[in-house]
Amino acid sequence: MGEVLWDLLPDGKILGGAPVNFAYHAMQLGAVGVAISSVGDDELGREIIDSVNSKGVENCIAVNNYPTGTVGVTLKDGKPDYTIYENVAWDFIELTSGAIQKLQQADAICFGTLAQRSAV
């Protein structure tokens, strides 16, 4: 539960956000992985939902009126430097009834530290 976003690298974008990465890897180990987050009602948000679905991760990703989250990634001396943008969709995660049901059924929950900057 938490941020789902696009890491914008100099050579393209990569699906990111620790919680969705955790859900994917948990699923690879035989667990049920569920992504709970929010994306914007925009092309980047639709691409995130498609990408999460194509990876086989169950999703409870709500769509809201904020832009889909992105993180700018640049390399300085071979090391990544991140620009994390605020007031994006995952800053305002809507807990849908489906998401609440998945949380109640969960054996473990991974939540992102970035999402802790907002009330949800």
Question: Where are these predicted regions, by residue range?
Answer:
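Secondary-structure boundary/capping motif
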Residues: 44, 118-120
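Short secondary-structure boundary/capping elements
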Residues: 1, 14-18, 64, 91-95, ...
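Glycine-rich phosphate/adenosyl-contacting loop at the front of the ribokinase-like
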Residues: 1-57
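Short glycine-rich, flexible loops that bind phosphorylated cofactors or substrates
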Residues: 7-8, 92, 117-118
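Conserved N-terminal subdomain of the carbohydrate kinase-like
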Residues: 32-113
